[in-house]
């Protein structure tokens, strides 16, 4: 699902905002991307539903062909309709009241094999870090989320000192 005319602009935007980084010709998601996806799944599931996006694409095509008024489409999207009362305005109101930033920015990795405590990656204002109990370590910028395993997190947490962990 996606409009070909907006593809390059979307790719540019997600790179600019830090949701992905470029490695060679590949776009690799960052921890910020995982937080954004978690927020969307938990609070805006209807907007990322495949059927909804497909129907919206069809309506956008109708606007492009002059078969539907763009103001009507925007009004219905934002305020909802009589058949479907929850528009974006209501979704945003609920998300503002219900969203827990600490939960959205926390990603479970596993359990520390020695202490039995949970190991989580948190996305904070200064970047991602791994945490277990009272110990945390910054995650190096070059480390992709799929490289964060329980073994790697344990090595980082058990290493002496602070700062970002760097591989040997």
Give, region by region, the residue ranges found by the protein language model:
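Basic, low-complexity terminal or inter-domain segments flanking catalytic cores
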Residues: 1-168
């Amino acid at each position: 699902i996606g409009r070909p005319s907006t593809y390059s602009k979307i790719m540019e935007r997600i790179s600019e905002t830090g949701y992905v980084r470029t490695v060679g010709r590949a776009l690799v998601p960052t921890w910020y991307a995982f937080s954004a996806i978690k927020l969307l799944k938990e609070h805006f599931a209807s907007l990322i539903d495949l059927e909804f996006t497909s129907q919206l694409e069809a309506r956008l095509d109708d606007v492009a062909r002059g078969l539907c008024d763009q103001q009507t489409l925007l009004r219905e999207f934002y305020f909802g309709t009589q058949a479907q009362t929850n528009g974006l305005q209501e979704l945003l109101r609920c998300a503002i009241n219900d969203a827990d930033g600490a939960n959205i920015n926390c990603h479970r990795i596993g359990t520390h094999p020695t202490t039995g405590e949970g190991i989580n990656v948190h996305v904070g204002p200064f970047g991602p870090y791994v945490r277990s109990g009272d110990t945390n370590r910054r995650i190096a910028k070059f480390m992709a989320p799929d490289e964060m395993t329980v073994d790697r997190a344990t090595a980082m947490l058990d290493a002496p000192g602070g700062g970002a962990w760097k591989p040997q």
